[in-house]
Curated annotation (Swiss-Prot):
Molecular-function annotations in GO: GTP binding; GTPase activity; protein kinase binding
Membrane protein topology class: Lipid-anchor
Organism from which the protein derives: Dictyostelium discoideum
Gene Ontology process terms (BP): actin filament organization; cortical cytoskeleton organization; establishment or maintenance of cell polarity; mitotic cytokinesis; regulation of actin cytoskeleton organization; regulation of cell shape; signal transduction; small GTPase-mediated signal transduction
Record key words, sorted: Cell membrane, GTP-binding, Lipoprotein, Membrane, Methylation, Nucleotide-binding, Prenylation
Entry's Gene Ontology cellular component terms: cell projection; cytoplasmic vesicle; cytoskeleton; plasma membrane
Modified residues (Cysteine methyl ester): C186
Family to which the UniProt record says this protein belongs: Belongs to the small GTPase superfamily. Rho family.
Lipidation (S-geranylgeranyl cysteine): C186
Protein name: Rho-related protein racM
Length: 189
């Protein structure tokens, strides 16, 4: 039985939770206790959705500006992009349009995108008093439509909320995209 490999790349501002999301998902829901900054990392995770096995090759990228020359090196052959912002960091949300979509259009136009709002557990946190600047779900949904994302979802790595659903959607979208684009492969002889 052939196992399909899906290349997933995560991008977004520094500190939005890319590494934590991937570590939690690939470690069976175990939230990491220490923060480890990432320049570039690759997680491999086997998933079974609707009886079909897939090997997820998930690339974690650094969000800092000083890595803008490194990120494009991993874009070739990407099947789907996870574009992350943190709901408590409005600047990371605004950077989706001002920074990230520009980079995507330059290096991998037409790639399927899932827009992901992270850290939704903070909406219910008693530790944060002023939540007036938090990004609301409807704002994320509107932005996903504006940028032409295939899907929008929110999740919490700390509470392991929405991660399984996110990666089920990744597999479904890549399967649909491959079925619709079987004849669009470029072959150079």
């Amino acid at each position: 039985m052939n196992i399909k490999t899906i290349k997933i790349v995560t991008i977004g501002d520094y500190g939005v939770g890319k590494t934590t999301l991937l570590m939690t998902y690939t470690a069976s829901g175990s939230f990491p206790q220490e923060y480890v900054p990432t320049a570039l990392d690759n997680f491999i995770h086997e998933a079974t959705i609707n009886g079909k096995k897939a090997s997820l090759s998930i690339w974690d990228t650094a969000g800092g500006e000083y890595y803008h020359e490194l990120r494009p090196l991993i874009y070739p052959e990407t099947d789907i992009l996870l574009l992350l912002f943190a709901i408590e960091n409005r600047e990371s949300f605004l950077h989706i349009k001002t920074n990230w979509i520009t980079e995507i259009n330059q290096y991998i136009p037409g790639i399927p995108i899932i827009l992901v709002g992270t850290k939704i557990d903070l909406r219910d946190s008693d530790l944060i008093k002023d939540k007036s600047n938090f990004v609301k779900y409807k704002e994320g949904l509107a932005l996903s439509k504006e940028i032409g994302a295939s899907h929008f979802c929110e999740c919490s790595s700390r509470m392991n909320l929405g991660l399984e659903e996110l990666f089920k959607k990744v597999i479904k979208l890549t399967n649909n995209n491959n079925n619709n684009n079987n004849n669009n492969k470029c072959i150079i002889l």
